[in-house]
Amino acid sequence: MKFLATAATALALAVTANTVAAACDDGEIVIKFSHVTNTDKHPKGIAATLLEQRVNDEMNGKACMEVFPNSTLYNDNQVLEAMLQGDVQMAAPSLSKFEQFTKTFRLFDLPFMFKNINAVDEFQTSETGQAMKESMTRRGLIGLAFWHNG
């Protein structure tokens, strides 16, 4: 009996997963957005859901976004490689994950490096901050913006 309950649960999850994936129509460009947070309480998850709704409303027939929260598709350690392989098109990993490409991103992990969140914003919008973000382009990743992670 326990096996049947487990099998039924697995089937329900598989059907649910297929239903989510079927939201995009044939011919639409599919944009997969993978992140590690929940969708109802964390600002990153809420923003990802709102972006998904906007893309799907405004790009109807041209592009379709599917958001995969809670590491359901990739975790922060895997997502950059998945992007380089074309398996996912958008992600919002912790900035520390970019250290595998360049050590300059360690700057954001140094304690007390910035006086407050406004100082972080000022640095990220500065010429130096923008150069850091753009440094990922030659590695095959395009940074759209910095996103606070805590």
Regions found by a protein language model. Name each.
Residues 1-29:
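Short, low-complexity disordered leader/linker segments with a strong preference
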Residues 32-49, 70-74:
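Extracytoplasmic "Venus flytrap"
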